[in-house]
UniProtKB/Swiss-Prot annotation:
It is found in: Cytoplasm, Sarcoplasm. GO terms for cellular component: extracellular exosome; sarcoplasm. The gene is MB. This is Myoglobin. The modification Phosphoserine is found at residue 4. The modification Phosphothreonine is found at residue 68.
């Protein structure tokens, strides 16, 4: 289920736009995640108290975490599927410490796709959309395999 060189190029091209504003993109992704799937908010002690979108937009912690999430994901995407070294500590912390179900990674993937569509409609056509969806699925499948190695069924 790997991506072709052309697909990776599409992914990395759109990711360049994300990196130009990691804080803004990250904030939007997390707000979209929390609004669309409020149960995910319960996994974040720092954000549980944020009930409205306005509160979320004002939260410096949320902005910071959004940047952290997208910085880590960008590092993984740039490995073009050869991301085992980057995935291992991420899977370890998300499985054993945070106990983040794989389903939540699907939810955040959907949020990422939505934010890319809304912020970059001219650069996020069908081919780029399909390539990004495939890259995020590869990431989720690989992290799910790491979860299983750790005995976490997430």
């Amino acid at each position: 289920m790997g991506l072709s060189d052309g697909e990776w190029q599409l992914v990395l091209n759109i990711w360049g736009k994300v990196e130009a504003d990691l804080v803004g993109h990250g904030q939007e992704v997390l707000i979209r995640l929390f609004k669309g799937h409020p149960e995910t908010l319960e996994k974040f002690d720092k954000f549980k108290h944020l009930k409205s979108e306005d509160e979320m937009k004002r939260s410096e912690d949320l902005k910071k975490h959004g940047k952290t999430v997208l910085t880590a994901l960008g590092g993984i995407l740039k490995k073009k599927g050869h991301h085992d070294a980057e995935l291992k500590p991420l899977a370890q912390s998300h499985a054993t410490k945070h106990k983040i179900p794989i389903k939540y990674l699907e939810f955040i993937s959907e949020a990422i796709i939505h934010v890319l569509q809304s912020k970059h409609p001219g650069d996020f056509g069908a081919d780029t959309h399909a390539a990004m969806k495939k890259a995020l699925e590869l990431f989720r499948n690989d992290i799910a395999a790491k979860y299983r190695e750790l005995g976490f069924q997430g």
